[in-house]
């Protein structure tokens, strides 16, 4: 009798194993749903350098639950624009290719660089890393281009220069001209230095030496203070500013004059 019972148990065990094997994806998805259902996206306050310009390329009003690749791109934009150093969201069950699309977007260096050009220099990244979990959790970790001390020093410098230039009552065009002349008068174009700060506004406004990205970051900080819509344009070896002035987008390249 015991032998028969053992045989039955063995047969049942084999049947259970076969059932699990044949339905492993469904079972895995079930437990994944249990884990994800208990998770909520945490939305923190944006920092003081969030841009609120109405860029047509990106959507500010999102709920951080993606259903398309464009939704994923907008999440990356808002994470950077808000100045968040880390953020987690989840791929919904209905969006079957979500994790693949996240991987595609997160690994697209050209796209990430383009998004970087639309946010304040203070919210731009030096490095951005995406981690994809089997529970459909997506983590974004941002290493900022500017640390907190550099931001403090530069923000104080920009405020001081604005006061010294006495531009409060000037038109936007006149403000830009004043800042343009100030940066060119106080920055030397330096492509020979090994100092990485030459690629930043710190190099231009504090050290007095910069390359194109340093010039453009410096100008962008002033434009943001004046609430003048702007972004950066970048190619493989050059960066300059694009400024919205008098209902037109205008190119502003300080480096061309800085090099002369």
Predicted regions and their residues:
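Repeated polar recognition positions within modular binding domains
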Residues: 87-90, 190-194, 207-208, 257-258
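Alpha-helix capping and helix-loop boundary segments enriched in small/acidic/polar residues
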Residues: 149, 207-210, 232
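Hydrophobic/aromatic-rich core segments of domains that either
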Residues: 214-260
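A short, highly charged nucleic-acid-interacting micro-segment common to nuclease
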Residues: 201-214
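N-terminal accessory/pre-domain segments preceding catalytic cores
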Residues: 3-173
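Secondary-structure boundary elements
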Residues: 148-204
């Amino acid at each position: 009798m015991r032998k028969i019972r053992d045989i039955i148990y063995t047969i049942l065990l084999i049947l259970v194993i076969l059932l699990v094997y044949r339905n492993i994806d469904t079972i895995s998805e079930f437990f994944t749903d249990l884990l994800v259902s208990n998770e909520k996206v945490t939305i923190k306050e944006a920092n003081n350098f969030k841009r609120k310009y109405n860029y047509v390329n990106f959507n500010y009003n999102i709920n951080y639950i993606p259903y398309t690749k464009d939704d994923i791109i907008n999440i990356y934009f808002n994470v950077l624009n808000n100045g968040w150093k880390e953020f987690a969201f989840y791929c919904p069950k209905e969006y079957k290719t979500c994790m693949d699309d996240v991987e595609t977007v997160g690994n697209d260096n050209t796209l990430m660089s383009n998004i970087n050009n639309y946010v304040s220099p203070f919210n731009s990244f030096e490095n951005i890393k995406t981690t994809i979990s089997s529970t459909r959790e997506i983590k974004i970790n941002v290493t900022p281009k500017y640390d907190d001390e550099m931001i403090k020093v530069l923000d104080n410098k920009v405020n001081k220069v604005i006061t010294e230039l006495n531009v409060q009552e000037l038109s936007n065009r006149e403000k830009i001209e004043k800042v343009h002349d100030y940066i060119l008068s106080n920055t030397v174009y330096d492509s020979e230095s090994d100092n990485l700060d030459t690629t930043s506004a710190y190099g231009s406004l504090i050290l007095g030496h910069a390359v194109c990205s340093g010039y453009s970051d410096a100008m962008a900080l002033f434009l943001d203070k004046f609430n003048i819509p702007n972004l950066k344009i970048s190619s493989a070896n050059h960066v300059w500013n694009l400024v919205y002035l008098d209902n037109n987008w205008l190119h502003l390249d300080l480096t061309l004059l800085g090099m002369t």
